[in-house]
């Protein structure tokens, strides 16, 4: 009897296995061997950026150029234009991978490889790509042996003067392999889009394409599941046609938006008889998008102005190597500011970034190219455009079109061809490709030569005409635009260094200083740009502007304007947050305008000005209130009200004649009804006497700590997956607990237990200290230490030491 039962169970198990055999399987490939010269090899974890460890040196990609986009006519030495890190040159990755038995096809998927990847399998070239920012797929079935070990090799080549910013080097985004049986859904040919939706009902169209041994009659079940896994709609399609199309009707749908990023799961199951041939699942959101002259930009039928930022792909001290926790930190910090959209400037986004934007609620303008035929740098993408651009734009759209967060495609940024008929024809061609593979979203691009683009018809052909800067020309632009609206596709380019203030305070488009820093009074910008105040005036006074994307949400490696020719500047000053991810004063300026759920009252500058006693030291307040009263050591400096007629006083509260005296400044802010909404205070700090930690574990907390001021004990949990990160902001305090804003002590870091020291960053654009060495100076009193979990569970102990003052502090994190 026992023997018979075992036989029956074995048979049942075999039948179950048969019914599930050969359905797709996705395997991540994180462990590779890496070499720069093909001789010395080291094991690395992918994503990997071979250049981020440095050292910084002006010799790396030293460019003698005139940047036409900046209005330059004479060539000058640009020492930090692409980050001053060793990303140029060749690199090689290899791994041995055993292809499991029972499958018929294998496809390698690269989410991005910098750059010009050539992929070989078992010594034979299997495929190649040109653009380092694009995802691509290579069918390696003809080159592998199932059930045996196979050698996969990737050769990369980064050439000098091929980038205007830091691109990184290597397999900087994930690599995976997809395994299939006899028949499967073509992964990027599955397209889910909302046809119409309101609170009562939605219609969702699903398109799919079968590949492999098609032609046989079969059954495809398409189901829509809610977040709890409950089936809310289903359709069954039968027959031999490999092209599948159906519509799902959903009652009382949850609509996706930044405020409520609800995600459904689409599950496609292909049957051959009773056997499951393939299962494809993907997350999507139900939502509608529209743009029009009368209603502007609409999400789910509601008009809203885009409150966006531009983001480069690097993650500061982590370089280009993608990391989930770091991306979450970026997105959450922007959302807490009130930002609701990201422009992926100026290249294709990653899968991970888009998935996080879907789940966290961040709209996206997914960009493609920084140049077309005419180059902006000698060896840039223009070399590949004619051969590769159709493939690249097709990959972008087909790869990412199921992400509800993406609300428009961008086909270019400040393209030199915008003056010509040829440029207009290219623009229309690229836009048509976007429409071919995704008729549900509008297409835009950022134009910086408005007169040329309007004269050639370049601007008129776009679904959404996007203009970079020159906000004062919006009036003339709109007169020639049949669309009846425009987008501030790139705005502001205000420059500042966190915690640095310059006197006298001036409004300037060309201010520079011997120390290579910019003033955080937020009155300095570039020759082609403007202040945030100028953009907001246009948006508030005229409905024709459907929103903006500020340059930039974060500082990034490379492009150290206005210090392009000043060494050792090697990263940007444009960010609302600095390179370490710490908010500058400007963060609170945007928060006061964009975050409608919380009040903002932020006072600047700091109040440590030894040697300026009795000198005029202006005080600003960023607030959503309309009025404020400032006190210096308890004495009122008067109540100030925002003034719509003044460029700098419409969106700021300013006390321009305050004379410095040590002690305390305090501001109290009020709304239009005279009710108090907030206050902020700054104290003159004494000598540093103690250390403070503020901890961020982005994958485990709802809000970025640097905004809300987390304590040492807050959110100390990490995933024991070898990838999770904790960001610990370190600052020095005096004996009374006041932050020391001028402290520049060198700190050392030691990590023990179930984790490792990953990197450190202080936000100083002129610092040449390597990110990956366990010591760094404070900048404006702060720096950020990044700790990475291992795959071992247990305590992770970070110890930070200031030898100069004999101050030491530790914190224990937990990897679970």
List PLM regions with ranges:
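Extended carbohydrate-recognition surfaces in non-catalytic/accessory domains of CAZymes
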Residues: 22-109, 162, 168-171, 183, ...
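Accessory beta-strand-rich segments of carbohydrate-active enzymes
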Residues: 32-35, 83-187, 212-214, 348, ...
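Extended substrate-binding grooves/exosites of carbohydrate-active enzymes
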Residues: 49, 53-56, 124, 129, ...
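Beta-strand-rich binding/interaction modules
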Residues: 119-121, 201-237, 246, 266, ...
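Extended acidic/polar, glycine-enriched regions
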Residues: 145-147, 207-292, 655, 661-662, ...
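Beta-strand-rich structural segments
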Residues: 206-210, 267-269, 619-622, 668-669, ...
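Short flexible loop/turn segments that cap and initiate beta-strands
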Residues: 216-221, 259-265, 624, 630-637, ...
């Amino acid at each position: 009897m026992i023997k018979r039962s075992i036989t029956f169970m074995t048979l049942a198990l075999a039948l179950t296995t048969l019914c599930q055999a050969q359905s797709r399987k996705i395997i991540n490939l994180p462990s590779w061997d890496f070499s720069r010269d093909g001789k010395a090899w080291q094991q690395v974890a992918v994503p990997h950026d071979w250049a981020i460890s440095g050292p910084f040196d002006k010799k790396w990609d030293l460019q003698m150029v005139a940047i036409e986009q900046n209005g330059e006519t004479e060539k000058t030495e640009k020492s930090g234009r692409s980050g001053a890190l060793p990303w140029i040159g060749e690199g090689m990755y290899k791994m041995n991978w055993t292809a499991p038995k029972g499958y018929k096809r294998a496809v390698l998927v690269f989410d991005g490889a910098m750059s010009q990847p050539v992929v070989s399998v078992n010594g034979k070239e299997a495929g190649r790509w040109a653009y380092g920012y694009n995802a691509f797929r290579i069918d390696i079935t003809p080159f592998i042996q199932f059930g045996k070990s196979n050698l996969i090799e990737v050769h990369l080549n980064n050439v000098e003067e091929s980038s205007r910013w830091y691109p990184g080097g290597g397999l900087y985004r994930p690599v995976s392999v997809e395994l299939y049986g006899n028949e499967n859904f073509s992964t990027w040919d599955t397209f889910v889009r909302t046809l119409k939706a309101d609170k009562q009902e939605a219609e969702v169209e699903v398109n799919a394409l079968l590949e492999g041994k098609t032609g046989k009659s079969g059954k495809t079940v398409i189901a829509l599941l809610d977040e709890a896994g409950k089936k809310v709609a289903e359709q069954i399609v039968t027959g031999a046609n490999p092209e599948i199309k159906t519509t799902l009707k959903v009652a009382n749908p949850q609509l996706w938006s930044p405020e409520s990023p609800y995600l459904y799961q689409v599950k496609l199951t292909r049957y051959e008889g009773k056997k499951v041939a393939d299962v494809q699942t993907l997350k999507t959101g139900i939502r509608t998008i529209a743009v029009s002259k009368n209603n502007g930009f609409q999400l789910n039928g509601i008009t809203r102005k885009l409150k966006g930022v531009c983001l480069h792909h690097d993650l500061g001290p982590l370089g280009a190597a993608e990391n989930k926790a770091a991306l979450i930190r970026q997105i959450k910090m922007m959302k807490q500011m009130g930002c609701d959209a990201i422009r992926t400037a100026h290249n294709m986004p990653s899968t991970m970034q888009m998935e996080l934007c879907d789940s966290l609620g961040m709209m996206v303008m997914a960009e493609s190219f920084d140049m077309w035929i005419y180059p902006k740098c000698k060896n840039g993408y223009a070399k590949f455009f004619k051969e590769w651009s159709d493939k690249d734009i097709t990959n972008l759209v087909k790869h990412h079109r199921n992400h509800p967060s993406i609300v428009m495609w961008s086909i270019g940024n400040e393209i030199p061809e915008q003056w010509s008929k040829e440029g207009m024809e290219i623009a229309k061609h690229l836009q048509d490709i976007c429409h071919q593979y995704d008729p549900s979203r509008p297409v835009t691009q950022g134009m910086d030569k408005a007169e040329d683009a309007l004269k050639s018809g370049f601007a008129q052909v776009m679904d959404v005409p996007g203009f970079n800067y020159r906000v004062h020309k919006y009036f003339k632009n709109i007169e020639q635009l049949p669309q009846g609206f425009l987008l501030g596709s790139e705005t502001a380019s205000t420059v500042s260094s966190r915690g640095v203030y310059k006197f006298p305070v001036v409004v300037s488009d060309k201010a520079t200083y011997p120390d290579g820093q910019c003033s955080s009074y937020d009155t300095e910008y570039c020759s082609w740009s403007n202040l945030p105040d100028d953009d907001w005036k246009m948006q508030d006074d005229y409905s024709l502007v459907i929103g903006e994307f500020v340059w930039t949400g974060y500082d990034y490696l490379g492009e150290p304007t206005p210090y392009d020719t000043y060494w050792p500047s090697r990263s940007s000053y444009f960010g609302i947050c600095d390179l370490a991810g710490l908010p500058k004063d400007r963060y609170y300026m945007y928060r006061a305008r964009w975050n409608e759920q919380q009040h903002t009252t932020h006072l600047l500058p700091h109040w440590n000005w030894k040697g300026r006693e009795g000198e005029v030291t202006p005080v600003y307040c960023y607030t959503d209130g309309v009025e404020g009263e400032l006190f210096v050591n308890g004495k009122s400096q008067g109540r100030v009200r925002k003034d719509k007629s003044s460029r700098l006083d419409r969106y700021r509260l300013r006390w321009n004649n305050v004379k410095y005296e040590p002690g305390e400044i305090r501001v109290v802010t009020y709304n239009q009804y005279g009710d108090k909404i907030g206050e902020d205070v700054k104290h003159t700090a004494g000598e540093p006497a103690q250390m403070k930690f503020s901890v961020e574990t982005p994958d485990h907390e709802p809000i970025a700590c640097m905004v809300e001021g987390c304590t040492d004990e807050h959110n100390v949990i990490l995933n024991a997956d070898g990838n999770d990160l904790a960001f610990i902001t370190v600052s020095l305090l005096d004996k009374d607990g006041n932050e020391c804003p001028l402290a520049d002590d060198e700190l050392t870091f030691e990590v023990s237990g179930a984790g490792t020291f990953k990197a450190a960053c202080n936000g100083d654009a002129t610092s040449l200290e390597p990110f990956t060495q366990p010591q760094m100076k404070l900048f404006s009193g702060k720096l950020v230490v990044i700790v990475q979990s291992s795959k071992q569970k247990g305590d992770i102990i970070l110890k930070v030491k200031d030898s100069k003052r004999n101050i030491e502090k530790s914190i224990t994190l937990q990897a679970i």
